């Protein structure tokens, strides 16, 4: 069965690259969600005034990977302890957020956060928001599959390989060939 979750963990190029490499993930789409502006575009998102976050919509096969596993990968490959920032990317559009379609998804997300918070995985408290998904807007085409199309873009070269290394180190059985 297919399920979908929307995740924001900084620049969507980075989060997208991680989940494109995960076994059981069927589709990853970059987009915008969580704000009030209708039909936002990249320029408006970058202003930080729309309320939207850069997010990815992850569609996955629940027979191959669970939502808990998706979320464990998400938390391991970005910093969920710093509000509105991932590395040099600063602003509410880069906040850590899990946008859910159901109460069950929210419960699972809160359970994963509680477990990670209690087991010492992070030195600081997790500040990731867990919210209902309202409006989601697909990002412009040039943002889709960005790293694979632009592997030598300097931002990507600097930011994405460390996240992929964490994926391979901590979740070797979940990395697609």
From Swiss-Prot:
It is an enzyme of class 1 (oxidoreductase). Gene3D superfamilies: Peptide methionine sulphoxide reductase MsrA (3.30.1060.10). The active site is at residue 11. This is Peptide methionine sulfoxide reductase MsrA. It catalyses: L-methionyl-[protein] + [thioredoxin]-disulfide + H2O = L-methionyl-(S)-S-oxide-[protein] + [thioredoxin]-dithiol; [thioredoxin]-disulfide + L-methionine + H2O = L-methionine (S)-S-oxide + [thioredoxin]-dithiol. Its EC number is 1.8.4.11. Belongs to the MsrA Met sulfoxide reductase family. One of its GO terms (molecular function) is L-methionine:thioredoxin-disulfide S-oxidoreductase activity. InterPro entries: Met_Sox_Rdtase_MsrA_dom, Met_Sox_Rdtase_MsrA_sf. It comes from Trichodesmium erythraeum (strain IMS101). One of its GO terms (biological process) is protein modification process. Keywords: Oxidoreductase. Has an important function as a repair enzyme for proteins that have been inactivated by oxidation. Catalyzes the reversible oxidation-reduction of methionine sulfoxide in proteins to methionine. It comes from the Bacteria.
